[in-house]
């Protein structure tokens, strides 16, 4: 029996380490960091870990908003989504994740483009529109 992508990525601890590194990289990336201006970092990490964990066959359950709702009014461009993907790939390379696993993970993330991108433009570094309403911070009970 073939091991799940979750297992091949190293489980929850490894996924968490990668997600933390991705988020930290994105917060420093001028191509996309403005989109995170009002995002709660802890919530973003928790929700992203749960989403990746569940999507790769792990035991986690993603309970956050769907991607259309979560990114509604963010004005994410095609260029910014591409910058996000490039940051993910750079971190996966830093963590020496194999090409097969990277391809499988990117194939999971790729369909989300249509739910996240609202602006058909290659522009990056756009400001977060004032209409965007971020999700609230996680309660202490949900962080664990």
Give a label for each model feature.
Residues 1-144:
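Core of compact, soluble alpha-helical bundle domains
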């Amino acid at each position: 029996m073939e091991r799940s992508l979750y297992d091949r990525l190293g489980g929850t601890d490894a996924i968490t380490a990668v997600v933390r590194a991705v988020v930290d990289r994105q917060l420093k990336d001028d191509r996309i960091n403005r989109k995170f201006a009002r995002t709660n970092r802890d919530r973003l990490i928790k929700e992203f870990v749960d989403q990746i964990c569940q999507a790769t066959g792990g035991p986690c359950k993603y309970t956050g908003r769907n991607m259309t709702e979560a990114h509604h009014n963010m004005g994410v461009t095609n260029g910014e989504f591409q910058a996000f993907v490039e940051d993910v790939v750079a971190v996966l390379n830093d963590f020496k994740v194999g090409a097969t696993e990277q391809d499988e993970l990117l194939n999971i993330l790729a369909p989300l483009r249509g739910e996240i991108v609202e602006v058909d433009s290659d522009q990056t570094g756009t400001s977060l529109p004032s209409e965007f309403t971020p999700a609230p911070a996680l309660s202490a009970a949900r962080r664990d």
